[in-house]
């Protein structure tokens, strides 16, 4: 086999592993975001459950469902805020307490209660910023057009749990567990068949090119989710500190 063919085969193997770990990372990040969102918005959205025998189509559909549920909650809460602004609610609440009592401790307690709920509009602002949820839905819809939806996660890569238990994701990517030659050949063949293009003279290269494109498209989605989580956590922390004073 030529060095070029070997290089293309290695590219396909590496792209398949990267896809596998991207899916795992996405599931983890989305569940973190979902938990944070549910607590902040006083709602309940089911977390993702991804297994090695999960179909890629089911995984992306779960993601889309979560984003749509979040958007629905955000839209409903945003409409409510538009009708009765937070500033008015704060002013009215504080004026009411002042009128009823001049007790400093009572005023302090009232302020804490106001700030406890003040982070909700911040969550809405973060998710509405640059149409994050809409952009994520659009990116996922684009990814679902690729011909890998009927594959299972294990078709891309299979971890040796015992061998990998104490290894980080990045280390796993660099140092994969020893796979049998038969399994490797089966994986390559399956990916080549699914990702092949018409009249391709080099199916391995074509498959590697397309899978690398898919992995590249997943990167920004993961980055957006991580930034959204960081921003939400930071803003919630600020308001928590304010409410504790």
UniProtKB/Swiss-Prot annotation:
Ranges of Basic and acidic residues composition bias in the record: 162-174
**Pfam families under this entry?**
DUF4533
InterPro entries named among the record's database cross-references: DUF4533
- In residue numbers, the region (Disordered) covers 162-183
**What name does UniProt use for this protein?**
Uncharacterized protein C12orf60
Lineage, top ranks: Eukaryota, Metazoa, Chordata, Craniata, Vertebrata
Q: Which gene encodes it?
A: C12orf60
């Amino acid at each position: 086999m030529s060095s070029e063919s070997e290089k293309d085969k290695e590219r396909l193997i590496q792209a398949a592993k990267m896809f596998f770990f991207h899916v795992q990372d996405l599931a983890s990040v989305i569940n973190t975001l979902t938990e944070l969102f549910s607590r902040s918005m006083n709602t309940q959205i089911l977390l993702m459950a991804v297994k090695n025998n999960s179909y890629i189509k089911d995984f992306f559909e779960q993601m889309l469902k979560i984003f749509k549920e979040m958007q629905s909650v955000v839209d409903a809460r945003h409409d409510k805020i538009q009708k009765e602004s937070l500033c008015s609610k704060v002013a009215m609440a504080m004026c009411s307490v002042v009128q009823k009592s001049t007790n400093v401790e009572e005023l302090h307690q009232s302020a804490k209660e106001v700030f406890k709920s003040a982070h909700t509009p911040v969550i809405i602002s973060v998710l509405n910023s640059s149409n994050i949820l809409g952009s994520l839905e659009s990116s996922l819809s684009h990814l679902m057009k690729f011909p890998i939806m009927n594959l299972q996660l294990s078709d891309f890569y299979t971890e040796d749990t015992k061998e990998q238990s104490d290894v980080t994701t990045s280390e796993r990517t660099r140092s994969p567990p020893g796979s049998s030659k038969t399994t490797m050949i089966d994986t390559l063949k399956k990916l080549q068949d699914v990702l092949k293009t018409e009249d391709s003279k080099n199916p391995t290269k074509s498959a590697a090119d397309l899978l690398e494109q898919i992995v590249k498209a997943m990167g920004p989605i993961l980055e957006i989710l991580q930034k959204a989580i960081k921003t939400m956590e930071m803003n919630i922390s600020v308001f928590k500190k304010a409410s504790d004073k």
